[in-house]
Amino acid sequence: MHRRDFLTHGLASVLGVLGMPASALAIGDDDRFTVSLLKYSQQGWNTRPTALRRLLQEVEKRTSVEIKPPPDGDHVTFGPDLFTRPMLFMCGESSFEPWSNERIDMMRQWMMAGGFLVVDSSEGVSDGPFLRSVRRELARIFPDEPERAIPKDHVIYKSFYLFNNDQHPYAEPHGRVEVDKRLRGHFDGDRVPVVISANDMLGAWARDGFGRWEYDVIPGGSPQRELSFRMGINLVMYALCVNYKADQVHIPFILKRRKWRVQ
């Protein structure tokens, strides 16, 4: 089952609880895939406004996924629009106030219905104020499921490009910086509804209107930026289905790319 279909069936009842008609659920109106930023507070939620458009351009160029490019800074807030997005990014570099219980419940419902959240810190450190605030809220959403490192054999690392494997052990998650060589997250069985990166992937993707990279990538330069794009593409491909069979995921793509090298 596609994640889009799963969200459509699973969230009609949620909209009813919110007092919204089923027609408010826009999933399915446009089969093209898109992602947005989560506006989680009044300030500091949009530190990398150009990044997602650049990522989706690469997704469309390298895969068969049809993309609906978002405008720079496209976002959703806590409310019915949340349930029109199968995948959201959350970025920042400063702390934010605790969410209300209603917002915690809404995020939990969205994730448990198939929503996929990627948290990407712009801070360049492993335990800055943004990530501390995020972890505070995720602990409320997942009180019985602590954050942990995503194992190297998880399908996220092979949904399109191969990472963390014997042939390419150097190919690890990267971003604008190298803070943590592991992605982290919370699990719902085998599924990972939320991924946490401290490496500022969005900073590596951000490009201005003249085509210039907005941030230097440290320490690896262009190869590190390429690995960051590949990780982003893997995350998008993971978001497109509710569950993957680890031994069958995108076999034609994987066979084609088993000998890839970063130039």
Which role does the model predict for each range below?
Residues 35, 87-131:
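Short alpha-beta junction capping motif
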Residues 1-14:
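N-terminal secretory signal peptides and thylakoid transit peptides that target proteins
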Residues 71-77, 100-106, 179-181:
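Alpha-helical scaffolding within the catalytic cores
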Residues 49-56, 104, 108, 131, ...:
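Extracytoplasmic/secreted envelope proteins and their assembly/folding machinery
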Residues 21-23:
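N-terminal signal peptide c-region/cleavage motif recognized by signal peptidases
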Residues 82-92, 160-169:
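Charged, often glycine-rich, active-site loop that binds/positions anionic groups
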Residues 25-87, 94, 201-202, 209, ...:
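Aromatic-Pro/Gly-enriched surface loop or interdomain linker
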Residues 32, 43, 124-229, 233, ...:
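An acidic, glycine-rich "communication" segment
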